[in-house]
C-alpha cells in the first residue's frame, strides 16, 4: 500500500500521503527493533536474516485491516476521479465526486491515526517469543515507544503540511 500512495500524491493531499507512508515507516522501524531485540543470542546479521529463527509475531489490528481497505478504495477513487467528475450528473444535487473523495481522505486519515496509535498502545499487536516474561515485557514496551514517538513525529509533520497546504489554497499568491 505504501508504494501506491506516493504515486497518487500529486492527485491528493501531501499531508495524507505523509501520514500513511509515515505510519508504515514507523512500523518498519519498530519491526527492525523487535527482530533484533528478540533474537536469541548470539546476535549476528546472518542470524537476523535467518527467518527459520522466529523471534516475534505481528498480529495486525482490526482497525489496521479496515484502514488498508479504505486506502485501497481511496487510491481507486482518486485514480478514477477525472473520469467520474465528467459524469457528475449521476450524483444527487450538491454532492460531487471531489467531495466524496475529500471526505474519504479524512476518513482514511482518521483510521490511519487510529491504526498507528493502536500499534503503539496495544500489547497484543506484537508477540515476542521466548521464555523470559520480564525481558519480553521490556522489549514490548520499548517497541511500542518506538512506534509512538516516530508516529507522533510523522503526525506533527502531516499537520504542518496540512496547514501549509491550507494557506496556499486560501491565498494562491502565498509562497511555499
Annotate each PLM feature:
Residues 34-176:
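C-terminal membrane-associated helical module and adjoining short loops/tails
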